[in-house]
């Protein structure tokens, strides 16, 4: 008799995706982040669900409802901090996952890559709207600043901003709709993640060497299930340490001050995971130019397959490209640091140089380095 997991209509899908899936035998720990992202998403949906049971999306009670969750609800504080720091872990895994895709040339699976970019934008939108919900100072002013960027769109900009606000400023209508969207979007992310996997399983996984691994595949279970469990345990360990020992480490103290439209905080800045994009936005003195640079800083990923000039897929055997990749990582860390600094003399210049370098590496230096490496191979 055939095993039920191979015949049952539902079990068959799970079996072909997570149990008997033929997987390259040489994929490294960098391939763990997909499953870690899945764990983060489930964690966020579950903690978010329990938070939504006690949260009220009204400007007069939103802040106090979050305080109530932390003080009066059984284990409410841990649910709230798991959700807040879970978002940080989510973005760490996301950036590692995208970085691995860039390093090993996974963007040549164009469908999977493009769905991934849509996923990235959706998760960013979800996180932004979630940050508005506690209705602290940084929530309110962050929402005001970021939604205001849309007013840079010619002709329809101002109308669009007021349409999103549901009035002439960020107010009750804005908070209510942001809560509605913040609740629904994770399920959209979940659906997109399934499509992402669907496209990935059409081609099979990439591997560090970048060459086809059809001749050397092993079943996903038990080899990679056990490897993923190790990654998951490390993720849970870091998250637990963060939540139990310094839950506010990555947050902004200004968000413990209730939103006040009459008092602007000295430094308006988003959560740490958006600082690199915020630095790129601020580095351009023109409003529309800044908004375009902000969008392009992520959208540039979509043209990576077109910029791939190398004869090899990954960077495993390409030292010049490797140096440029790590320069890009250092540049992004610099941008993240600059995004959190005030708009003053040395920071402005550093931010502008780092922004130029970011686009230079991706658009100019990496394709040229690949061509040079191709020529070196001929010798």
Swiss-Prot record:
Compartment list: Mitochondrion inner membrane
InterPro entries: Cyt_b/b6_C (IPR005798), Cyt_b/b6_C_sf (IPR036150), Cyt_b/b6_N (IPR005797), Cytb/b6-like_sf (IPR027387), Cytochrome_b (IPR030689), Cytochrome_b_C_euk/bac (IPR048260), Cytochrome_b_N_euk/bac (IPR048259), Di-haem_cyt_TM (IPR016174)
TM region positions: 33-53, 77-98, 113-133, 178-198, 226-246, 288-308, 320-340, 347-367
Pfam families documented for this protein: Cytochrom_B_C (PF00032), Cytochrome_B (PF00033)
Cofactor(s) the record lists: heme b
Entry note: cofactor: Binds 2 heme b groups non-covalently.
Protein name: Cytochrome b
Organism: Pusa hispida
Upper lineage: Eukaryota, Metazoa, Chordata, Craniata, Vertebrata
Gene that encodes it: MT-CYB
